[in-house]
Every structure is written in structure tokens, then in C-alpha cells.
Amino acid sequence: MPEAPRERPAHAVILREFSAHIRARPKPIFDSIARRFDPGEGARSLYTADSSAWVVIVQGGWWYRAEYRVIPDDEGATIEHALVSVAETARRIGRWSGRKALDTAPAEFERLITSLRAELE
């Protein structure tokens, strides 16, 4: 499976951002996020899970990029999530085309955090 670029493209636009804290060690959090979002062999999505940078990136379609960062601290880790438009042309249409993903993103992030807490805390 092709890797997603580690660096966010210069023309990219952040559409939504979320964060939450989990009282668990960073490595199991990272591993769980990486496992959940790995599209598997043969997927058309680009995917990178970089444990040295604590980042998981899934990029697919012409506009969509999801970034997950695990930021360790003394009491666990903060999970940061960004939905990013990487559309190279028609950049304004990315928000419109992705409106369903953007509308459901808060609830999806909350489900992820609830699940991670149940699994790891």
C-alpha cells in the first residue's frame, strides 16, 4: 500500500480539528489508532503510521486527509485529529464535497475516544 506523505501539503486547508486526553500510555494508544485506520493491502488510500513521530495519516480521494497525533504527557496522552482538504484544484469544493464527513466528524471522534478509553484506561 502506498504511503501518505508525512508532511501536509503547503496548499492544504484544515477543515476540522479535535483533541482529547486519554489516561493511558502513548504506545498502546498509537498502536490502537494505527490498527483501526489501516486500510489494509490493496486499498486505494494512502496510509502512514510513523511510531517515531506518533502520527497516523490516511489520505484518499482527491481531497481527504485525516491526521491523528498522539502527544505524550505525564498522565497519558492527548490525541489530536485534523481533517484536511488536500485538493489541488477546486479547493473550495473540498469542503462542500466532504460535508457529510465533516458533519459526522465530531461524533466519530467522540466514538473513537470513548472506545480508546474503554480499551486502554
Description of each model-found segment:
Residues S19-H21, V55-I57, T78:
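Ser/Thr- (and often Asn-) enriched beta-sheet segments in non-cytosolic proteins
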Residues Y47-I57:
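Short, hydrophobic/aromatic-rich segments at coil-to-beta transitions
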Residues M1-S45:
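Hydrophobic ligand-binding cavity/cleft-lining segments
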Residues P28, S32, S115-L120:
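Generic non-transmembrane alpha-helical segments
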Residues V58-E119:
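Beta-strand/loop substructures that line and gate deep hydrophobic ligand-binding cavities in soluble
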Residues I14, D50, W62-Y64:
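Residues that act as N-cap/strand-start positions at coil-to-secondary-structure junctions
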Residues I22-K27, Y47-A49, R69-T78:
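A short, structured loop/turn motif at beta-sheet edges
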